[in-house]
Amino acid sequence: MTVEELIVYGKGKTSSDHAKMLLSSYLDVNPLELLTILDKEVDSDIEKLYKSSLEALKENKPIQYVIGNVNFYGLKFIVNKNVLIPRFETEELVEQVVEYTKDLNKDKIKILDLGCGSGAIGLTLKSILKDSEVTLVDISKEALEVAKLNANNLNLDVTFIESDWFSNVKLEKYDIIVSNPPYIRTDEEIEEIVKNNEPSLALYGGVDGLDCYRKILANIKPYLNNKFLMAFEIGESQKEEIYDIVNKYLKDIEITCKKDLYGRNRMIFVRNKID
């Protein structure tokens, strides 16, 4: 079958966008490039893979898991059922952290990524901040295996620790500690495709969604350098509660909440107060 015939076939199984996304991924081209190769005959093995993937989509599997990777900040990350699918909004968190490093005036920045999942945040920071020392932490051995594959594919030299937050992390000082922890309430309604496919360990943060923030902030102080930044992704309604938790454990700080591109409170930044 030709590219055009497969696109038409795919539209009968899923959305036009998903059909093109799948096919372009397997042909290793940009979706827009499909229009330039509509008459191209597609290898039979790719055709079979494409058709089987369309069936997986009909079973309400996330397209990122079906393809097996996702683009994040211009980098390709392997994803599977053991890791949360990196969201576009998290790229904004990375951008803000990179911007902050300009104020540090320091060559070798030490960064800790807590609950790293696929490694999207920590590995992206390492790819941008070449001289930084990055440590990625996750409680899930399976998630760390995915993160290690991504580090290898991206040729990034980082450290991995299997740990329940700080429990196995050696006491060292970090300039930046970043985390996108589970923050969904246990009784919160979420999309079926998310609930049925992405790891619950990476989604749910207890009755009020704040358990992980409490655990992190209760133990974070000894790991902070004299000049530091903490960066968290949060649920859009959690700003005030997290401010309270931060202020319970840390003094002489500045807290900033930033909105994402959709105008939602989604990022909190904590740094030492500058006189």
Language-model segments: what does each one mean?
Residues 92-191:
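Conserved SAM/SAH cofactor-binding pocket of Class I
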Residues 25-100:
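Conserved AdoMet
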Residues 136, 205, 231:
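Conserved SAM-binding loop
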Residues 181-212:
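Mobile active-site "lid"/loop adjacent to the S-adenosyl-L-methionine
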Residues 208-271:
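Conserved Class I SAM-dependent methyltransferase catalytic core
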Residues 67, 161-164, 234, 259:
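Short loop/edge segments at beta-strand edges and connector loops
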Residues 1-35, 40:
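Non-catalytic accessory regions of SAM-dependent methyltransferases
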Residues 22, 60, 90, 121, ...:
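Residue-level signal for inorganic ion chemistry
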